[in-house]
Amino acid sequence: FDEKIVPLMVEENRLVTEYGKLKASAKIEFDGQILNLAEIARICECQDRQKRKAASEAKYAWYESHESRFDEIYDRMVRVRTEMAHMLGYKDYVELGYYRMNRLDYNREMVAGYRKQILDYVTPLACRIYDRQKERVGYDRLEYYDLAYQFDSGNPIPKGSAEDLVEAAVNMYHEMSPETAEFIDMMKNDELWDLIARPNKEMGGYETEIPEYKSQFIFSNFNGTS
């Protein structure tokens, strides 16, 4: 770390935030509803193939309509991170990125070898898995909108509402031990999670720690898929 890159780190953080806000702003009109990216993802896995296709096309049409903004954010991020690396004496951002993520036990040459192994061994395996999926769902050919569809009877879905799932989790932790019961009650009572997909909510999910409170915070986008 060097204080001279602080302005670049601020700009980097601003671009990450801008990217998240852009994806959270998605309003996709589909089947009489206005959906965000997390919500339309559920329809992209539904049993109706034509509906899956239409939902996927609507989702990617939104991305296409915002292509210039995504490109601009990406371009600015590459420039910021490259400048950051150069200021710290690195050839490019790759090596610096490894250090920033504490990836100290391998380097870019090892990763290049790993990519080659993926191509040689994992890709053929993935193709065989897709062939089995194609037979399982009864299609002659898998299209891009079929890849998330795993079973002819429909993909598994959570049993019950989001509230039911939370209550089941609370009960499970109560059955495990008094300590886990106390902890999950604290998280529930202090609202230390934000779980359900809603308009203008950032995509994705994560768990992070709040050390000064000796607690975690959980962020996710429950959307009716498993």
Question: Could you say what each language-model-derived stretch is?
Answer:
Residues 38-50, 160-225:
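Active-site-adjacent "gating/activation" loops or surface patches in catalytic cores
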Residues 1-156, 166-168:
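A well-structured
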